[in-house]
């Protein structure tokens, strides 16, 4: 699409069964700069990522998705990325959508682009829907910004955006914290619809729907508590 240097960041925890294929699919779309952050995995995620040709950074302990993503963003800053894309490492995000996310940035129409599952095709597990609704509400209450999919991990950032924001929260609440910083920095944000790939592997995570709905609610409550704690500390 352009001469822009694009890096793909994959925070990963125990994704050894699928990470190599995920990296392969990303590279098949022409994006060869892939960084995997192995967040203290106990399986072969690290080895599989290296064998697939990804730049691989390992956390010695599991620090959380937020910490892993921030490590990846730090790395792309140092490597001089023009555009950085974050994706989930379990194969749910379609690499064909990367172009859709980076295009507004390359054309100077946005600083941050969110891939929204709510604007795309339906079929999201109910636990994820609940977590997303809670996340949207919490993001608006704490940071005054409303988007359709505040908890989406499929995002693209311009160099300007990465130079303007930095998250401190280690787990899933960092998604909301990042949006708050985007607003504070007065960066241009855009949402685009994405197609989520629900494979047998990914759906296995939600096979007991009631249990995962309860877990989604619990995670939402934990997120609120951590955001309150972070606000009080500041």
What are the residue ranges of the model-derived segments?
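Short hydrophobic beta-strand elements that form part
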Residues: 7-11, 35, 58
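Acceptor/aglycone-binding surface of glycosyltransferases and processive sugar-polymer synthases
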Residues: 61-63, 67-78, 95-172, 199-224
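Catalytic donor-sugar/metal-binding loop of nucleotide-sugar-dependent glycosyltransferases
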Residues: 146, 169-170, 180-197
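Acidic helix N-cap motif at the loop->helix transition within catalytic regions
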Residues: 17-21, 43-52
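Short beta-strand-to-loop acidic/aromatic patch adjacent to the donor-nucleotide binding site
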Residues: 81-90
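Short, well-formed alpha-helical segments that are part of the catalytic scaffolds
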Residues: 13-28
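A conserved acidic beta->alpha catalytic loop
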Residues: 38-46, 91
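Cell-envelope/extracellular polymer assembly enzymes that use nucleotide-activated donors
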Residues: 5-7, 177
